[in-house]
């Protein structure tokens, strides 16, 4: 029971540190589109795709998968999880469900971001 928890925790620490570092270094370059965020989202998508394929053909302990996918990619970006879910739907020929999931994630995220901002300003009295 402890090895899975430690695997996730260690991966999470490393993913979060990398996200923070890339944000610090890359976001100031072109603030209109935070390059650190774009970089971690694209890298996370690549890493999770590669890792899912690799672990599907590997005899490694499941703890390595927890370290890379759940821990590292989960802390680096949640976009990587979203990406693999959409690609899995597309590979299964579920184009309609993939488009629906994309719409829900994208529109839902924007709506909840706006709701979060509005809630803050409402609570703060601004």
UniProtKB/Swiss-Prot annotation:
It is a multi-pass membrane protein. The chain crosses the membrane at residues 4-24, 33-53, 67-87, 97-117. GO terms for biological process: cellular detoxification of fluoride. One of its GO terms (cellular component) is plasma membrane. Na(+) is not transported, but it plays an essential structural role and its presence is essential for fluoride channel function. InterPro entries: FluC. Na(+) binds at residues 74, 77. Its main location: membrane. It comes from the Bacteria. The keyword Metal-binding applies. It is found in: Cell inner membrane. It catalyses: fluoride(in) = fluoride(out). GO terms for molecular function: fluoride channel activity; metal ion binding. Keywords: Cell inner membrane, Cell membrane, Ion channel, Ion transport, Membrane, Metal-binding, Sodium, Transmembrane, Transmembrane helix, Transport. Belongs to the fluoride channel Fluc/FEX (TC 1.A.43) family. Fluoride-specific ion channel. Important for reducing fluoride concentration in the cell, thus reducing its toxicity. This is Fluoride-specific ion channel FluC.
